[in-house]
């Protein structure tokens, strides 16, 4: 059976709300989460039918924006 090689660019927008005391601490927390995701090298997606499909990650990049204080 022949195989196919696909290069896919996937942009995910993830909003994380945390209890950090400052924008710097908040950015540090989110950076740590992104770096751990970089190390995982695999992500799993839950399909509508309940099955799970795993995808290998390579050359992943991230950018953190809009670290701001939330109103209480």
Swiss-Prot record:
Subunit and partners: Homodimer.
Gene transcribed to yield this protein: yopT
Organism phylogeny: Bacteria, Bacillati, Bacillota, Bacilli, Bacillales
Source organism superkingdom: Bacteria
Species per Swiss-Prot/TrEMBL record: Bacillus subtilis (strain 168)
UniProt protein name: SPbeta prophage-derived uncharacterized protein YopT
Gene3D superfamilies: Protein of unknown function YopT
Coiled-coil ranges per UniProt: none
Listed Pfam families: Yopt (PF09467)
């Amino acid at each position: 059976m022949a195989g196919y090689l696909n290069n896919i660019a996937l942009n995910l927008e993830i909003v994380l709300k945390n209890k950090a005391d400052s924008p710097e601490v908040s950015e540090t927390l989110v950076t740590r989460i992104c770096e751990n995701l970089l190390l995982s090298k695999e992500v799993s997606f839950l399909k509508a039918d309940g099955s799970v499909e795993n995808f290998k990650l390579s050359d992943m990049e991230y950018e953190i924006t809009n670290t701001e204080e939330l109103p209480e």
